[in-house]
Amino acid sequence: MTSPTTNFALVNNTGSSDAYAYVTGLDLGDNNAPVFIQSDGKTVYKPTSPSAPQSPLAADVAIPLGAAGSTTSVTIPHLAGGRIWFVVGGKLTFVLNPGPAIVEPSVTNQDDPNWGLHWGFAEFTYNDVQLFVNISYVDFVALPIALNLRNASGAEKKVEGIPAGGLDQVAQKLEAQHAADGAGWDKLVVRDGAGTLLRALSPNSGRVADAGLFEGYYGAYVDSVWAKYAGEDLTINTQWDWGNLQGRVVDGDVLSFGDQGTFAKPSAGDIFSCSTGPFGGYPKDKADVLGNLGARLAAAFNRSTLLRNASQPDGEQVASYYQEAVTNHYARILHEVNVDGRGYAFPYDDVVASGDDQPDQAGTVFDGAPDLLTVTLGSLQAASDGGDKKEKEGDDATPGKEKDTTGLWKGFLGFVNKATGGCFGRS
């Protein structure tokens, strides 16, 4: 059982005194009511339902981060679906709709008052069991954010985030990928009217802004996968009570897992979202098992490993991810640019092979006895071209993933998040 509250230390490493944080979440002790932490960093603001949409907040929820180099303390109660929002060079605008429901900043709506600001967030859930945190790139990448979680015994886990100039690297690499294949990766790079780089969108967010983006992109690859598994089994280790399940393409049409259900061919939009087409709308009586299978299929499509490995996710090696010409190059580039190679780049980036003792790709930190989470806004390291992802000698590296006997690492695997109200892999 965790303490009723935990402590966050927010470090302003931006070089600017015009930086703010916001904390939102769902109150686990009050039927998931939406809450903010107020500007003092400790008082909970629980908005009431307004009479009209787009109503202003009744409290100041902008937490000033102070002068460059300063640290601000924040007290966090048990929350699900939490986000720590950061902005530099202004303040974010949050409003309320009846419910109440928080209207959050948008990166896909140019009419949103926050669209032209430099902002980003990390995600967390703090419940009776643990504090679980990640840097999310599922929607976009913008500001450098780093995590360091210290537990009650003094042990630390960390995620280093993108380096100084990391967003510029991401933009350059996306534009270079478009120059190589003409697929539209450059359209993920977002600049304001003056040409200032604001952020890079994920392919899924890019398709929200432009529904035709990447149309047909995965078509030939999916056809090749279907042809391969018309002649051999695809084995998926569910890493759960269902064990290994075998799939085979039948009638040239669907990938069938027998009595468990089938998957039609996914489109690029389905693959990038991980939640539409064959990866969503499961029959109620099979939702759990198909959600599990769908998570592993979606991860393998994003990483483009299905033609290389007929046993998913077992046998997967990080070095084999994103090696095909058709792949999620946004995810590839994010992992290349991050200092330690870790960060949630698509909704099921937490899928890993059983027995994998390497640090997770998703860039999570979690502990059942958290003492202090330090979240640094602004890079901890200077720019490099992706750099050496190995920890330097003497550094306190994040240990490998804790496992239970089924090989499921002790976080919230993507489909479990959705079922339990977790915050990870949202878009």
Predicted regions located by residue number:
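Extracellular low-complexity, O-glycosylation-prone Ser/Thr/Pro/Gly-rich "stalks"
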Residues: 2-427
